[in-house]
Structures are given as structure tokens and as C-alpha cells.
Amino acid sequence: MRLPYYFLSLLFPTILMGQAYIHPENNEAFLQNEVAEIHITVSQNHLNTLLGDSLYSNYHFPGVFRYESSSFSDTLENIGFRVRGNTSRNAQKKGFKISFNENVVGQKFKGIEKMNLVGQHNDPSLLRYWTSLYLLKKHELIASRMSFVKLYINSEYRGVYLNVEHIDDEFLQKRFINDDNGNLYKASWGADLNYWGANAASYKSVYELKTNKDSNDYSAFILFLDSLNNLSDGDFPCYMERNFEVNHYLKTLATEIIIGHWDGHAYNKNNFYLYRQPSNGKFIFIEYDLDNSFGIDWFGIDWANRDLNDWHETNRPLVERLLDVPYYKDVFNAHLDTMLSDLDSSSWYSVLAAKQNLIKSAVLSDTYYRKDYGFQYSDFLVGLDDNYGAHVKNGLAEYLDERITSGLGQIDLIGDLEPACDELTHEPARQIVKIVDFIGRETLFRTDIPLIIMYDDGTAEKVMVWGN
């Protein structure tokens, strides 16, 4: 079968035509080779209220922020400080949010307006969230920057925290250059992406508009949900290609499933953003809050062996309708195959071991690490390889090893290379000769998976090289 190259360009835009976003470099706010210190000073009365009557409030209490590293220090006054999270607000090791511009308009710390400090009280390894973001970035997907820090509040050491970049207008400006003024919707629990009617009020408690709040416009979002749920099977693929970053999402979904992030959209209808890019009107999917992953479990489900192609919960129209299209199911499985194969042959364990070594001295003196589940320092040291029991069904590396082995046996490539949308047209690309795998990565011959040979006349041919 010979296919016009422009179909590949349309279906694999982030690979063959350049992705529409960038990942900014780390700076002093996100140090990778040391554990910086954050010191928060607030009045004791305010701290008592913050941790007491105001625990479930998002009210910011005024304070002073000081940041200390081996080569850099800075102090910002009149910042806002509060508890963050959902169920984790009940934890002994709570998460916190710092808002640098809450009381001083335009105040930033190293280009960021807000800082999320995640306690990771469920995770004895303290590495699950970090590893999730690391893999999103490795897979060239949109991800927050992150770093480990030591947190002090009124001189009391509160433990090791993961500093996670906040998703807001500053986040968009650093990733969508000259295309950052669109609507950003934050989806919390209940976000199944079903159509709930034309009234915007029906959506606002679950899908919070985080940018352009004055216009308060949900019209394009509601139209997208209406179309996602109600278009015919024949019209669905072309609509999605015009209005949603399909390949980016299929790649994100593959990552979400591989890491066992059940607290995201596909299983728990939770924890994601949708951003509508002004330049093309397309929505793009962004993950956040990825700490419940890599074998953390409250449902009695074996996430390390769960079927990759039947992993999601029911009543998820975005996942179900996309994977009902044979072409998209193949693209999804090709992403899974590539990611699992890369993990199988990479040195990811040494990356995790190095990060564990970086933070271990800070964990040793973290008394809050022990307060929620009785974790001991010894549990941290074996957190990569051994399960803790209870809700921690796998060590992080133990989970990955098991997921790679089981996952490679669950790949389901149909081999259907017909484009999902055949009415889009595009001029043929410039002359090119190369071999790519099914998701557009230049490669050598591999056995038992589809490969695409691209010719200098703008056509392409699918081949299979069978193993023994």
C-alpha cells in the first residue's frame, strides 16, 4: 500500500512537522543536582489558623519566602501561603502553595508566580511524582518542571517536598510561544468529558476556567464536548483532527497507563487541564497531580499487569471513541510499544537511584515522612525495589519491570494504516528518504511491527519485517 506522505504529516504533527510547544529549561527555581531550602515565615496565629479552621480554605496568609541553594539565595516579602491538595489536606505531611503575586501585583520568583510543594505522603520512595514528570518530558509531552526542596516553616523542618511548577498563564507563556492567551480549563474529580447540556453553569464546578476569567467563555469547550459525544462515527475523526491534538493525547494516554496513574482522566476522571490554542483552535491535554502511580493502589487492582487496551474505566468518551477508531488504536499501541521497548533497553534505574541518593540525607531527618503511614528511613532506601504493603503494592522499579514485561505482551497492533480522516488535504512534503516506525521515529528495521518507507516522490509504503 502506498500512502501520500501528507497523511503522515497530518497524523503525526509533533514528530514529522515539529511540535507546537517547547519545554523550558530548568533554572534556579528547579535545581536538579542539589536539594535547595525554602524557608517560610508567617505569624504563629496565622499558621495555627491555616492548619486549623482554614485547612479547607484557599485563603492565602501573608508571609516571607526565603530560598537558599549553594550558589543562590533570594527573599521575597508579602507572599501568600496556604495548604493545597484535596484529600491530602488531612495528611500530617500536608502540601502547600506559595503565591508570590497574591499581595504584590507582578511579583515573581525566577519567572514563576506560584509554587506547589507536594508532600507525597502516600509514597515511601518519594520518587513517583518526579518519575512521572520525568517520563512525560522524556516522551516530549507537556510537563511541569520539578525539583526536590527542604521546607522550613517558622524554622521548623517540615521535610522533603517536590516543588512542582504551577500550571497557569506563566506556564503557557513558556511553552506556547506567541500562542499563550487561550482558555485553560482545570478539570477536577468528575471530569468524564461527557456532554451535560448547553448551559455553562453545569460545567463550572468541575472544569474551572483559569485564564480569561473576565470573558468567562465556555462556548468552544461545550461545543467540543457536544461533538466528542454526539458526532457520528463517520464525522468524528475529522472533527477531532481539526479541534484536538489527537496524537499528543494518544501519547499522553500511553504514558498515563504505563505509569499506572489511575488518578487521572482515563480511570478516575480527575486531574488534567485542557488548553485551547488560539492559533488553530485545537484543545491539548495536560496531566497534573501524578503521585498516585507506579503501584500505589486503593482499589485492589493489579496496575502492573492490567490490560493496556482495556485499562480505562467505562463512560470515558474521549478514550473510548478514539480507541474505537482502528487507526487511532494502532497509533496508541505503537506509542505503547515504543515507550515500553525504550524503557526495556534504557538505564532508567540508574536515573532513579541517583535521585534517591540526592535526597536521602534530607529524608533521614524528615520526621513528617513517618507520621502518616509509619514509613521508616529503611522503607525509603528499599522503596525502588520492594513493596511496602498496604496501599503500596509495588516498589517503583519493581512496578516498572513488571509493567514492561506484561505490557510488551499486550501490544495489539492491527496494522491498519488507512488515515482516520481522509478529507484533509495538504501539499506533498519536500523530497525525503528515510525509514520510520509507526509513530514517525526514524529507525532501523525492527521485526514484527509496521515500518514506513518514505520515498522522494512524496509517497510512503508500509512494510512488515517478520521475526523468526
Each model region followed by its residue ranges:
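Bacterial Sec-dependent N-terminal signal peptides
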Residues: 1-21, 421
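Conserved NTP-binding catalytic cores of kinases and kinase-like/nucleotidyltransferase enzymes
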Residues: 19-125, 131
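Middle-to-C-terminal accessory/interaction subdomains
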Residues: 20, 27-28, 35, 46, ...
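A general beta-strand register signal
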Residues: 66-68, 152, 437, 454
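Internal "kinase-insert"/substrate-recognition segments embedded within catalytic cores
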Residues: 97-105, 119-120, 139-144, 156-259, ...
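A conserved helix-loop-beta module that forms one wall/lid of the active-site cleft
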Residues: 120-154
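Residue-level detector of functionally pivotal "anchor" positions at catalytic/ligand-binding pockets or at interdomain
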Residues: 410-443, 468
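C-terminal tail/sorting-segment detector
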Residues: 450-468
